[in-house]
Amino acid sequence: MDYRMCWLEYRGLPADVAGKLKDWFSSVSILEPGSSVLKDEIRRFSERSIGITPRFYSRPLKKEKYIMVGRLESLPIKLDVNLGEEGFMLRTIEWNGSKILLVTGETKKALVYGIFDLMKRIRLGEDIEKMNVLAKPKAKFRMLNHWDNLDGTIERGYAGNSIFFKDNRIIINQRTKDYARLLASIGINGVVINNVNVKKREVYLIDSIYLKKLKKLADIFREYGIKIYLSINFASPVYLGGLDTADPLDERVARWWREKARGIYDYIPDFGGFLVKADSEFNPGPHMFGRTHAEGANMLARALAPFGGVVIWRAFVYNCLQDWRDYKTDRAKAAYDNFKPLDGQFDDNVIIQIKYGPMDFQVREPVNPLFGGMEKTNQILELQITQEYTGQQIHLCFLGTLWKEILEFDTFAKGEGSYVKRIVDGTLFDRENNGFAGVSNVGDSVNWTGHDLAQANLYAFGRLAWNPDEEIERIVEEWIKLTFGDDEKVLENVSYMLMKSHRTYEKYTTPFGLGWMVNPGHHYGPNPEGYEYSKWGTYHRANWEAIGVDRTSRGTGYTLQYHSPWKEIYDDINTCPEDLLLFFHRVRYDHRLKSGKTLLQTMYDLHFEGVEEVEEFIKKWEELKDRVSPDIFERVKERLHMQLEHAKEWRDVINTYFYRRTGIPDEKGRKIYP
């Protein structure tokens, strides 16, 4: 095997712990037909962590201690619990003269989740004799979006090539199954396997030439409770069907999609549905035919509805041909302006997928006002696990801290307590089909994610999607212990690095919600005016005196899309959170912040501080040289040194840019290039 298994590397447990577990794992009763996945995982854990090979039975046992795995309905013990479709229970009980650790749920996938959770808890030191866990996911949809292309490349991928595709073929191998294991262990239940930008070759993924292989892929993922989805091109009836239109209100088009859906479900009965990027960045959509997003999405949804499928429709729609001289058009307003008027017009099996912020996964953005703005529409929160604008898995940038802030944001849509996490789990507006989507950071590299520590982003996404109330510090501790073991120094140093890393990255790149000071196209490295005169609506409009776009009620009016009190808070430069100051306001460089320092001096200071913090990360990592495996140590060390050099470049380019703009030097006399 030429890759590691991230947090599922089952290492040997301490001898005293393994000794206590041997009695439990020597005999396992699995009351579930077709339970090879359950047996395989238990066997793998037992052999590697405990040092024994368990014997499996399909009946209750007469034994002092053992594990029993089965659906609630198949247990010889009657339990009055409501677990739902995906919830599970781990409970140690005494029954019929035996001590039994029960792993139970109402479905097979619940048992899979339960087994992975049991292994995790044992590895984290919990006592099997006192196990009492009842866990249910908060959100129905917990998905990964792969931006993988059939040729094997990955759009915005920084961890090698696709694990799904190569040379226009679908790949199925041992790594496919291991990926399903990784995802099931963190509660992911859906995977979109191809890029939302569906090119001419990818259009054929819904055709019979690929469906036979897709069926095999779906069969593997199904065993782990995961449905597969496909991104589609809205104009497929033209490209594939030979029609002269893709108008969603044309009956020929609707019929074509109904027949195509039937063909897919003939191969994959539990196919999840379609992800659609329409009328966005030159992708075709219903606007081409004078139709609304609701009309386009509903037509597709009705083709899938008889089979239980859903349409996930991205809200990433804006004018991508803006003239930089146009001061009235504001890209930040686009998603709300396009979709808010359609609230309540989408079918029940349509879900609008909304990026966390109104722009495009910048280092920091405000929460998208569509969260709280659409009460009658299913919504999925889209987060970007892959680090397109946050260091591309060369820089250490743990995103879990940012995601937690987003989830805890109170929209005030129904008064105080209207948190984003309550919107995406469906409870605030009583919506069933809500959830999470994360743009995957996975490729075929040895560590799956390019940077070994970027695995923490994938792990944190899954854990937060399962339970957005989980403390991020706990998630970080779990990942470190599962990945590196129980070394306290490793836990201390890596936790420090992860928890600080996003703020550090923000400091030496674009603080204050500035954004977009990157090189066009590939989005790596500093370029203060790389997008300043482009068609993409990505402007900061810096001159010698001030910087930032006025998005207040006196400017573009973006602040008016929020509920009170946020519209008033963001509208006032004195109450606007400073970490978003330049997103909402045009600010003079001599404006005094709460610290008493000017905006410009703070900008200088932050960029120097950010570099110093990366130097600190390197020292922290060097202290772990003999405490983590040599290959991981060297890979992370190499990336941290690359990060340091690139952070210095960011510091010098951005500070020089502002110095040359303003002529105002750094008060502390540090090196800035005139």
UniProtKB/Swiss-Prot annotation:
The active site is at residues 281, 360, 388. Alpha-glucuronidase involved in the hydrolysis of xylan, a major structural heterogeneous polysaccharide found in plant biomass representing the second most abundant polysaccharide in the biosphere, after cellulose. It catalyzes the cleavage of alpha-(1->2)-glycosidic bond of the 4-O-methyl-D-glucuronic acid side chain of xylan and releases 4-O-methylglucuronic acid from xylan. Gene3D superfamilies: Alpha-glucuronidase, C-terminal domain, Chitobiase/beta-hexosaminidase domain 2-like, Glycosidases. GO terms for biological process: glucuronoxylan catabolic process. It is an enzyme of class 3 (hydrolase). This is Xylan alpha-(1->2)-glucuronosidase. It comes from Thermotoga maritima (strain ATCC 43589 / DSM 3109 / JCM 10099 / NBRC 100826 / MSB8). Optimum pH is 6.3 with more than 50% activity occurring between pH 5.2 and 7.9.
